């Protein structure tokens, strides 16, 4: 469940697939996950895509990947070593494809995977080659952020890429 190509505007990087996504074969497939609604409301897609339409993200200049490929019920089941290893692999992919931005969906996952302390939300000072790195709230239904808060965070990235 990875969609990478040269010249993308943004690559959205989830933490890892949930069991629903692993079973269905689509990223962010759990009905409680707000990813598809949020990226549409933020402006990244003209219409709201369903999880099974995930490959159409590329038509909108967007890619998708995950820090860790192993599916779990909750991201908290991942070890620090898995996240660090995933961060190293992610950096290699981003350096190869060089999208304009990498959006990591989750602050704790970012700080662990990249060895960064006290990262703010939004644009980071860290870049990967020419790629800007952003940290956005995870759209999981387990995240307490409201739909409006999520959309505002993702919209900030969308507007920065205009």
Curated annotation (Swiss-Prot):
Record keyword Ribonucleoprotein present: no
Subunit structure and binding partners: Binds DNA as a monomer.
Purpose: Excises ethenocytosine and uracil, which can arise by alkylation or deamination of cytosine, respectively, from the corresponding mispairs with guanine in ds-DNA. It is capable of hydrolyzing the carbon-nitrogen bond between the sugar-phosphate backbone of the DNA and the mispaired base. The complementary strand guanine functions in substrate recognition. Required for DNA damage lesion repair in stationary-phase cells.
Gene3D superfamilies, per database record: Uracil-DNA glycosylase-like domain
Single Gene Ontology MF annotation: uracil DNA N-glycosylase activity
InterPro entries in UniProt: MUG/TDG, MUG_bact, Uracil-DNA_glycosylase-like, Uracil-DNA_glycosylase-like_sf
Identification of the protein by name: G/U mismatch-specific DNA glycosylase
One Gene Ontology term from the biological process aspect of the record: base-excision repair, AP site formation
Catalytic activity: Specifically hydrolyzes mismatched double-stranded DNA and polynucleotides, releasing free uracil
Pfam families tied to this protein: UDG (PF03167)
Family listed: Belongs to the uracil-DNA glycosylase (UDG) superfamily. TDG/mug family.
Coiled coil spans: none
């Amino acid at each position: 469940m990875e969609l990478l190509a040269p010249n993308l505007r943004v690559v959205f990087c989830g933490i890892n697939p949930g069991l629903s996504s692993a079973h269905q074969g689509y990223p962010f497939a759990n009905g409680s996950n707000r990813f598809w609604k949020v990226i549409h409301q933020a402006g990244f897609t003209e219409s709201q895509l369903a999880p099974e339409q995930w490959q159409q993200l590329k038509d909108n200049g967007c890619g998708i990947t995950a820090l860790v490929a192993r599916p779990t019920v909750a991201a908290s089941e991942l070890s620090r070593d898995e996240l660090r290893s995933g961060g190293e692999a992610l950096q290699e992919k981003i350096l190869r494809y060089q999208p304009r931005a990498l959006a990591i969906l989750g602050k704790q996952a970012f700080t662990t995977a990249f060895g960064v302390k006290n990262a703010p939300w939004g644009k980071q000072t860290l870049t990967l080659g020419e790629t800007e790195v952003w940290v956005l709230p995870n759209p999981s239904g387990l995240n307490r952020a409201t739909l409006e808060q999520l959309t505002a965070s993702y919209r900030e990235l969308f507007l920065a890429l205009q």
